[in-house]
């Protein structure tokens, strides 16, 4: 894409800015692997970053820092009990190196419109993890096409789509829909060790280690 940041402003950030309240009302349940990941790796000493926290639905333990680009969703997240809420961009995380024991990235990087930007975000999340730290990554998989109304994103790859919101043709979000092979390749190319991976409904997840 010729202007990926402009494309994401139009088909990602604008969507969440204009629809944050309605969207947040439909996103109250945390994704299933999130609880299992925290049960396996969280301790009372852990500091956790939710990078792209949305409305805070993954705030399941103490000492969680929530970061999101959308101010409307961050306002909703205040009620969910995050220790600290920060407006920021996953492409340039506002944290020093090796700050966190655990990182969550739930339904975030599939909104980045080029492979280079997705890998950059992954490397940023790896940067802020402590050595040996763990990360849970979730993305939408290609099977999501069977459940929503998608159209191909002009100028993108065969995995780049625009999805309508509540069947409103004038409101669309961008997604890069992953296959498992491509997701795991991204993880290893970004310097992570893959500990586990699988599927949950139309989504794919990977448990990673720095």
From Swiss-Prot:
Assigned EC number: 2.1.1.-
Domain of life: Eukaryota
Biological-process GO terms, alphabetical: methylation; tRNA modification
Gene Ontology terms for molecular function: S-adenosylmethionine-dependent methyltransferase activity; tRNA methyltransferase activity
The keyword Methyltransferase is assigned to this record: yes
Family annotation (InterPro entries): AlkB_tRNA_MeTrf/Diox, Methyltransf_11, SAM-dependent_MTases_sf
Record-stated family: Belongs to the methyltransferase superfamily.
Protein name: Putative methyltransferase ECU09_1500
Source species: Encephalitozoon cuniculi (strain GB-M1)
